[in-house]
Design a protein with these regions (language model features):
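Short, mixed-charge amphipathic alpha-helical segments
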Residues: 12-27, 84-94
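Short, well-structured alpha-helical segments
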Residues: 21-32, 48, 96-103, 186
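Conserved structural-core and active-site-/substrate-pathway-adjacent residues in large, well-folded domains
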Residues: 31, 71-74, 99, 142, ...
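Hydrophobic or amphipathic alpha-helical targeting/insertion segments
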Residues: 73-107
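Alpha-helical scaffolds flanking conserved acidic
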Residues: 49, 53, 64-73, 94-98, ...
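Nucleic-acid processing machinery
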Residues: 1-16, 33-40, 48-60, 79, ...
């Protein structure tokens, strides 16, 4: 048996005990077969992503069964070996509806405008066109995976892609409240567009992480104890470090140099 698939099913069963294992196995097997064939036979395969990586990204968001199936099959439509009619017969109308929404988003040629108003209009267009929020969640998960593949494509293309992600998809992730994707996309885009600044902040934050985590854990415990003492025993308190891009922007707004140690402590 496939260990990756078995682990995924175990994760899904935690929140969706009635999941149809055979249905997901069928979609997974199909996606792996076509993915491996594309990698082997397509000349320009640097930007082909593995569908199961998209699914792995999604699991923490507790997607339903149709969403998982659609995530497995989404990029396979480009192979020309899979058609919506066949997918509907095998997996149902719900999956086809998600895939059609993803195809619409994928077909949009995103143009990076200078005008903030035009950018906002484009973001709204994405939100209007994706009437099912699950479509955007899958699409954002794909963007996270694609950002990892940018090192293997020419720098002018990777910079254009990273700029598009920061201008369009990061705000969408924020509007949907998916802050994990927001921070990942911001930091990956920042690394591509401003590698030197990224390296400085990465080094600086790395020196402070242990001290910062100890402080966050200490304060979290104090707050948790406080709530518990006042009858709120189920309250969970946690903290996190800011993303590199967020630190960069805050320091920029304050006019502070990147190597200003004191400011890093404030994050």
């Amino acid at each position: 048996m496939d260990k990756w698939f078995d682990a995924m099913i175990d994760d899904i069963k935690v929140y969706l005990p009635q999941v149809d294992r055979d249905r997901l196995l069928s979609a997974y097997t199909l996606s792996e077969t076509i993915y491996k064939d594309r990698i082997k036979n397509e000349k320009y395969n640097n930007f082909i992503f593995r569908p199961r990586d998209v699914v792995k990204n999604l699991i923490s968001l507790k997607p339903d069964e149709d969403t998982v199936v659609a995530a497995f099959l989404y990029d396979l439509l480009d192979s020309g070996r899979l058609y919506l009619r066949e997918i509907e017969e095998e997996y149902g109308e719900g999956v086809v509806s998600l895939l059609e929404g993803l195809q619409i988003l994928k077909s949009i040629m995103v143009v990076r405008y200078q005008s903030t108003d035009k950018l906002d209009l484009l973001r709204k267009l994405f939100l209007v066109m994706a009437k099912d929020i699950r479509v955007l969640v899958i699409f954002l998960s794909v963007k996270v995976i694609q950002m990892d593949l940018l090192e293997d494509i020419p720098s002018d293309c990777s910079e254009a892609f990273a700029t598009e992600v920061l201008e369009i998809f990061v705000p969408i992730a924020a509007r949907l409240g998916i802050y994990r994707y927001k921070m990942i996309l911001e930091d990956k885009g920042f690394k591509i567009l401003h590698p030197d600044d990224y390296k400085k902040i990465h080094t600086q934050v790395g020196e402070l992480v242990k001290k910062k985590n100890d402080y966050v854990d200490s304060v979290s415990k104090i707050l948790a104890d406080f709530y518990s003492d006042h009858g709120f025993g189920d309250v969970k308190v946690s903290g996190r470090l800011k993303g590199y891009y967020s630190i960069h922007n805050k320091m920029k707004k304050k006019g502070l140099p990147l190597l200003y140690k004191k400011e890093s402590h404030s994050h």
